[in-house]
Amino acid sequence: VWCSGCGIGIALYALFEAVREMGIQSQLCVFSGTGCTGKIAECLNVSACSAGEGFAVAAAAEWRRKNVQSKTVVFINNADILLTGASDIIESAKNQDDLVVIIINNLIYTLSEGRAYPLTPFMRSSAVFGVDLPFNIPYAAHRAGAGLIARWNPMRAGWMRHTLIDALSAEGLSVVEMVSPCIVFRTDTKEILGPVERMSFLNDLSEIRYEKPSRDLDLRHPGKIIFGGFAPAEGKGESDCHDR
Protein backbone atom coordinates (compact mmCIF):
# COMPACT_ATOMS: atom_id res chain seq x y z
CA VAL A 1 0.00 0.00 0.00
CA TRP A 2 2.80 2.41 0.93
CA CYS A 3 6.28 2.85 -0.48
CA SER A 4 9.04 0.70 0.92
CA GLY A 5 10.57 2.55 3.85
CA CYS A 6 7.57 4.85 4.39
CA GLY A 7 6.95 5.63 8.05
CA ILE A 8 3.17 5.20 7.78
CA GLY A 9 3.31 1.42 7.77
CA ILE A 10 5.84 1.43 10.60
CA ALA A 11 3.69 3.76 12.71
CA LEU A 12 0.70 1.51 12.06
CA TYR A 13 2.76 -1.53 13.10
CA ALA A 14 3.76 0.22 16.33
CA LEU A 15 0.10 0.99 17.04
CA PHE A 16 -1.06 -2.58 16.54
CA GLU A 17 1.77 -3.95 18.65
CA ALA A 18 0.66 -1.57 21.42
CA VAL A 19 -2.99 -2.57 21.00
CA ARG A 20 -2.12 -6.27 21.02
CA GLU A 21 -0.06 -5.91 24.18
CA MET A 22 -2.89 -4.02 25.89
CA GLY A 23 -5.58 -6.43 24.65
CA ILE A 24 -7.90 -3.65 23.47
CA GLN A 25 -8.50 -4.74 19.87
CA SER A 26 -12.29 -4.67 20.27
CA GLN A 27 -12.20 -1.09 21.60
CA LEU A 28 -9.98 0.35 18.87
CA CYS A 29 -11.31 2.81 16.31
CA VAL A 30 -8.98 4.42 13.76
CA PHE A 31 -9.62 7.59 11.76
CA SER A 32 -7.41 8.73 8.90
CA GLY A 33 -7.05 12.00 7.04
CA THR A 34 -5.87 13.07 3.62
CA GLY A 35 -3.18 11.86 1.25
CA CYS A 36 -1.34 8.63 1.92
CA THR A 37 -2.58 8.46 5.51
CA GLY A 38 -6.11 8.25 4.10
CA LYS A 39 -5.30 4.72 2.90
CA ILE A 40 -4.98 3.50 6.49
CA ALA A 41 -8.71 3.15 7.12
CA GLU A 42 -9.12 1.16 3.90
CA CYS A 43 -6.64 -1.50 5.01
CA LEU A 44 -7.78 -2.29 8.55
CA ASN A 45 -9.93 -5.08 9.91
CA VAL A 46 -11.07 -2.94 12.83
CA SER A 47 -13.52 -0.04 13.19
CA ALA A 48 -12.04 2.60 10.89
CA CYS A 49 -13.06 5.66 8.93
CA SER A 50 -11.35 7.84 6.33
CA ALA A 51 -12.72 11.24 7.29
CA GLY A 52 -11.52 13.29 4.34
CA GLU A 53 -9.40 16.37 4.11
CA GLY A 54 -9.21 18.38 7.29
CA PHE A 55 -11.95 16.55 9.21
CA ALA A 56 -10.20 13.54 10.73
CA VAL A 57 -9.53 14.91 14.23
CA ALA A 58 -12.95 16.56 14.52
CA ALA A 59 -14.72 13.40 13.35
CA ALA A 60 -12.70 11.26 15.75
CA ALA A 61 -13.46 13.60 18.65
CA GLU A 62 -17.19 13.44 17.92
CA TRP A 63 -17.03 9.64 17.72
CA ARG A 64 -15.17 9.43 21.02
CA ARG A 65 -17.73 11.59 22.81
CA LYS A 66 -20.51 9.24 21.66
CA ASN A 67 -18.50 6.06 22.36
CA VAL A 68 -16.79 6.65 25.67
CA GLN A 69 -15.27 3.15 25.86
CA SER A 70 -13.55 3.53 22.50
CA LYS A 71 -9.78 3.82 22.17
CA THR A 72 -9.71 6.33 19.34
CA VAL A 73 -6.63 6.97 17.21
CA VAL A 74 -6.25 9.50 14.39
CA PHE A 75 -3.61 9.41 11.64
CA ILE A 76 -3.01 12.74 9.89
CA ASN A 77 -0.22 14.39 7.93
CA ASN A 78 1.02 17.90 7.21
CA ALA A 79 -1.76 18.67 4.75
CA ASP A 80 -4.41 17.97 7.38
CA ILE A 81 -2.76 20.41 9.77
CA LEU A 82 -2.53 23.09 7.09
CA LEU A 83 -6.15 22.59 6.05
CA THR A 84 -7.41 23.30 9.57
CA GLY A 85 -4.64 25.46 11.00
CA ALA A 86 -4.57 22.87 13.81
CA SER A 87 -7.86 24.32 15.07
CA ASP A 88 -9.33 20.82 15.46
CA ILE A 89 -6.39 19.72 17.62
CA ILE A 90 -6.72 22.86 19.73
CA GLU A 91 -10.45 22.25 20.18
CA SER A 92 -9.92 18.61 21.19
CA ALA A 93 -7.30 19.63 23.72
CA LYS A 94 -9.65 22.26 25.19
CA ASN A 95 -12.45 19.70 25.42
CA GLN A 96 -10.08 17.14 26.97
CA ASP A 97 -11.06 14.56 24.37
CA ASP A 98 -9.40 11.20 24.93
CA LEU A 99 -7.70 10.95 21.55
CA VAL A 100 -4.34 9.77 20.26
CA VAL A 101 -3.29 11.86 17.25
CA ILE A 102 -0.41 10.42 15.21
CA ILE A 103 1.05 13.02 12.84
CA ILE A 104 3.10 11.68 9.93
CA ASN A 105 5.48 14.55 9.25
CA ASN A 106 6.46 13.83 5.65
CA LEU A 107 8.03 17.29 5.14
CA ILE A 108 5.83 18.03 2.12
CA TYR A 109 3.99 21.32 1.68
CA THR A 110 3.58 21.52 -2.08
CA LEU A 111 1.24 20.35 -4.82
CA SER A 112 -0.32 16.92 -4.52
CA GLU A 113 -2.19 15.23 -7.38
CA GLY A 114 -2.50 18.57 -9.15
CA ARG A 115 -4.25 20.31 -6.25
CA ALA A 116 -2.82 23.21 -4.28
CA TYR A 117 -3.03 22.55 -0.57
CA PRO A 118 -2.94 25.44 1.91
CA LEU A 119 0.36 27.25 1.84
CA THR A 120 3.08 27.49 4.41
CA PRO A 121 3.81 30.99 5.74
CA PHE A 122 7.06 30.99 3.76
CA MET A 123 5.84 30.56 0.18
CA ARG A 124 3.40 32.58 -1.93
CA SER A 125 2.46 29.58 -4.04
CA SER A 126 2.45 25.88 -3.32
CA ALA A 127 3.77 25.39 -6.87
CA VAL A 128 7.09 26.90 -5.79
CA PHE A 129 9.55 24.10 -5.05
CA GLY A 130 10.61 24.03 -1.43
CA VAL A 131 10.18 22.30 1.90
CA ASP A 132 9.35 24.29 5.03
CA LEU A 133 7.70 23.53 8.32
CA PRO A 134 4.86 25.86 9.36
CA PHE A 135 5.47 25.33 13.07
CA ASN A 136 7.15 23.21 15.70
CA ILE A 137 4.66 20.33 16.11
CA PRO A 138 5.55 19.27 19.70
CA TYR A 139 5.57 22.89 20.86
CA ALA A 140 2.26 23.62 19.10
CA ALA A 141 0.72 20.55 20.73
CA HIS A 142 1.87 21.60 24.18
CA ARG A 143 0.62 25.15 23.69
CA ALA A 144 -2.73 23.73 22.62
CA GLY A 145 -2.90 21.73 25.86
CA ALA A 146 -2.05 18.15 24.88
CA GLY A 147 -1.01 16.04 27.83
CA LEU A 148 1.38 13.57 26.19
CA ILE A 149 3.76 14.62 23.41
CA ALA A 150 6.38 12.52 21.64
CA ARG A 151 8.36 12.37 18.40
CA TRP A 152 9.91 9.30 16.74
CA ASN A 153 11.34 8.20 13.40
CA PRO A 154 10.75 4.94 11.46
CA MET A 155 13.82 3.28 13.02
CA ARG A 156 12.30 3.65 16.48
CA ALA A 157 9.14 1.56 16.17
CA GLY A 158 9.78 -0.15 19.51
CA TRP A 159 10.06 3.18 21.32
CA MET A 160 6.93 4.40 19.55
CA ARG A 161 5.06 1.29 20.67
CA HIS A 162 5.83 2.10 24.31
CA THR A 163 4.76 5.70 23.75
CA LEU A 164 1.45 4.57 22.23
CA ILE A 165 0.77 2.27 25.18
CA ASP A 166 1.16 5.30 27.44
CA ALA A 167 -0.98 7.43 25.11
CA LEU A 168 -3.79 4.87 24.90
CA SER A 169 -3.80 4.65 28.70
CA ALA A 170 -3.77 8.41 29.27
CA GLU A 171 -6.66 10.80 29.65
CA GLY A 172 -6.99 13.77 27.33
CA LEU A 173 -5.24 14.46 24.05
CA SER A 174 -1.96 12.78 23.14
CA VAL A 175 0.08 13.82 20.08
CA VAL A 176 2.78 11.60 18.60
CA GLU A 177 4.83 12.89 15.66
CA MET A 178 6.49 10.46 13.24
CA VAL A 179 9.21 12.23 11.22
CA SER A 180 9.30 10.35 7.93
CA PRO A 181 10.31 12.39 4.83
CA CYS A 182 8.32 11.31 1.79
CA ILE A 183 10.51 9.29 -0.55
CA VAL A 184 8.49 9.94 -3.71
CA PHE A 185 9.03 13.67 -3.28
CA ARG A 186 12.79 13.17 -3.76
CA THR A 187 12.68 11.15 -6.98
CA ASP A 188 12.64 14.18 -9.26
CA THR A 189 15.99 15.33 -7.84
CA LYS A 190 17.49 11.83 -8.20
CA GLU A 191 18.49 11.88 -4.54
CA ILE A 192 16.47 8.82 -3.55
CA LEU A 193 18.27 5.99 -1.73
CA GLY A 194 17.24 2.49 -0.72
CA PRO A 195 14.78 2.10 2.20
CA VAL A 196 17.42 0.99 4.68
CA GLU A 197 19.84 3.73 3.58
CA ARG A 198 17.13 6.38 3.90
CA MET A 199 16.10 5.30 7.38
CA SER A 200 19.70 4.91 8.50
CA PHE A 201 20.53 8.38 7.22
CA LEU A 202 17.64 9.87 9.19
CA ASN A 203 18.56 7.83 12.25
CA ASP A 204 22.17 9.04 12.10
CA LEU A 205 20.86 12.60 12.31
CA SER A 206 18.79 11.74 15.38
CA GLU A 207 19.29 11.88 19.12
CA ILE A 208 16.97 10.58 21.84
CA ARG A 209 16.50 13.06 24.68
CA TYR A 210 13.56 12.82 27.03
CA GLU A 211 11.98 15.81 28.78
CA LYS A 212 13.61 18.37 26.50
CA PRO A 213 11.54 21.59 26.43
CA SER A 214 9.22 21.44 23.45
CA ARG A 215 10.09 24.99 22.36
CA ASP A 216 13.60 23.70 21.46
CA LEU A 217 12.39 21.04 19.00
CA ASP A 218 11.98 23.00 15.77
CA LEU A 219 13.29 20.84 12.92
CA ARG A 220 14.64 23.94 11.18
CA HIS A 221 17.18 24.47 13.94
CA PRO A 222 20.70 23.19 13.16
CA GLY A 223 22.01 20.10 14.87
CA LYS A 224 20.54 16.70 15.64
CA ILE A 225 16.83 15.93 15.32
CA ILE A 226 15.60 15.29 18.85
CA PHE A 227 13.31 12.33 19.49
CA GLY A 228 11.61 11.11 22.66
CA GLY A 229 8.89 12.29 25.03
CA PHE A 230 8.97 15.97 25.83
CA ALA A 231 8.43 18.38 28.69
CA PRO A 232 5.80 21.10 28.26
CA ALA A 233 6.80 24.61 27.37
CA GLU A 234 6.10 27.13 30.08
CA GLY A 235 2.36 27.72 30.21
CA LYS A 236 -0.09 26.71 27.54
CA GLY A 237 -2.80 28.32 25.52
CA GLU A 238 -4.28 28.04 22.08
CA SER A 239 -3.52 31.67 21.29
CA ASP A 240 0.19 30.87 21.19
CA CYS A 241 0.08 27.57 19.33
CA HIS A 242 1.52 29.00 16.13
CA ASP A 243 4.58 30.49 17.80
CA ARG A 244 7.63 29.64 15.73
Go through each PLM region and give its residues.
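Active-site diphosphate/adenylate-binding microenvironment
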Residues: 1-52
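Short acidic, glycine/serine/threonine-rich loops at helix termini
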Residues: 41-44, 84-88, 111-116, 186-191, ...
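Conserved thiamine diphosphate
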Residues: 116-166
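ATP/pyrophosphate-binding catalytic subdomain of soluble kinases
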Residues: 148-186, 195
